[in-house]
A protein has these predicted regions:
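Short, acidic/charged, Gly/Pro-enriched secondary-structure junctions
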Residues: 80-112
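Helix-start/capping segments and mature chain N-termini
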Residues: 1-80, 84-88, 114-288
Length: 288
């Protein structure tokens, strides 16, 4: 029987200093008006794929989560407690039938200004149908300069996505589905709004090498596995013109997984013969 996603998310609150975890009703408020997540966007998060009852690529997500907390000088996350909350939320969400997919989000903020106590919670919820459609149909993408600077010394996945979301709204208003950011000075490719860019030419997989790019957990898993399967994987400087000449271009991320770029600005990109193979590589990488 096919798994039917729940309408309501499952939420577990995590005690940041390693205490208990507890279930939270989604119909009740969770954070206060003076929480730094609301007033400053001061916090970190990770989006994880749950597939058949298990979190994909959890070691890389956990490592980046800890690094992000360190970069923002938040108390070190007690990862075992986050994993415990995640397992409980997954069990509640799937109700014993651990087939199908879901999205899991870890959120960790600096907390209330009045208490200085961090806020932390885990959510498991249905994957947006639009993301599932994009896996199958691909996305139309426009390139755009990233006009804000990302410090190399702050390699954190923070909650402050306001500028990125504004850029996505602009792109969608122009008929595109997504964006690829480029350096405003050099024009080299950086990353997608919520994804890493991967270009395929023959048996070569390439991803941008540039300053200010957040390390992609999904891209790293893909490259590690693909290398073992005989692909030549490398990070290098990439231009939009290079992408247009490739066999295929992909946006890879944890929940949406691999989405093919069908057009870049005004250029339609050809459909590759090995699209299923590339998706299969990523699925296999995430299943390990």
């Amino acid at each position: 029987m096919e798994f039917t996603p729940r309408k309501e998310p499952v939420i577990y609150v995590v005690e940041p200093y390693g205490g208990s975890v507890r279930k939270h009703l989604p119909s009740l408020p969770l954070i206060y008006w003076d929480d730094a997540a609301v007033t400053r966007g001061d916090g970190i998060f990770e989006s994880l794929l749950v597939r058949d009852g298990k979190v994909a690529n959890i070691a890389r997500h956990s490592a980046r989560f800890v690094n992000s907390a360190q970069a923002l000088e938040l108390p070190e996350p007690q990862i075992e407690k986050w994993k415990e909350a995640t397992e409980l939320a997954i069990a509640d969400y799937f109700g014993g039938d651990e087939t199908g997919e879901a999205k899991c989000t870890w959120t960790y903020t600096r907390g209330r200004a009045s208490t200085g106590h961090p806020s932390a919670w885990v959510v498991v919820q249905a994957i947006d149908k639009k993301l599932l459609e994009q896996r199958e149909k691909g996305v139309k993408v426009m390139t755009t300069p990233r006009l804000w600077h990302v410090a190399e010394e702050l390699p954190a996945k923070t909650l402050n996505y306001a500028a990125t979301m504004a850029t996505l709204r602009l792109a969608k208003g122009k008929g595109f589905d997504d964006v690829i950011f480029v350096d405003p000075d050099s024009g080299i490719v950086l990353e997608g709004a919520t994804s890493s860019v991967v270009a395929v030419r023959g048996n070569k997989l390439r991803t941008p090498a540039a300053k200010g790019i957040l390390s992609g957990t999904t891209q790293a898993a893909l490259f590690e596995y693909a290398q073992q399967q005989g692909y030549r994987c490398k990070a290098k400087e990439i231009t939009p013109e290079y992408l247009e000449r490739c066999d295929s271009v992909w946006l890879v991320s944890s929940v949406r997984t691999a989405v093919r770029v069908t057009s870049l600005n005004d250029a339609k990109l050809k459909a590759p013969d090995n699209a299923a193979e590339i998706r299969g590589l990523l699925d296999a990488a995430l299943a390990r």
